Amino acid sequence: MSIFNNLKLGHRLALGFGLVMSLMAALTLAAYVGLSDTNDDLHSIADNTVPSLQVAADLKSTSLNLRRFEYNHLVSEDPSRLLVLEADIAKQQADLLQTFKAYEPLISGDEDRALWQEAQADALRYVSQWGAIQALSGQIGGAGKSVAEERLTGPSREYFEQLQAKLDKL
């Protein structure tokens, strides 16, 4: 400390100012590195996570619409309404399978890929149930409606719930 005491006031002030400026430079560098890392993380989220969440939400929405149209088909007694619903169902099925393809480039890891493959398999199993249900559900006033309802609330519902559980994890 005797060296510091022997310095003139101007030199002491210059040394103190130099130390403060050195600390400020170190803090600025640390802040820059921290902000750079944060920027990289934000770009990763914006470029990968947000689009994959949007597509996953689209998958969920499409599958829920598909299920709603199936139930509407089951309760409808109007032949022209049945035709409209069948077209809506076919469109939703195609949209669902197409949206699965749109999700593939957004897959970010092995776990995500495995979950996507399982969800896609569940979607195919679920969609494949509709053919038999449609034939029975279209029988107006017949016993086919009750059999269609059993299938819609049985195996089809099971596949639908499995699909929804996977989509919730995507």
Model regions and ranges:
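Polar/charged, Q/E/K-enriched amphipathic alpha-helical segments with strong coiled-coil propensity
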Residues: 42-46, 71-87, 97, 101-170
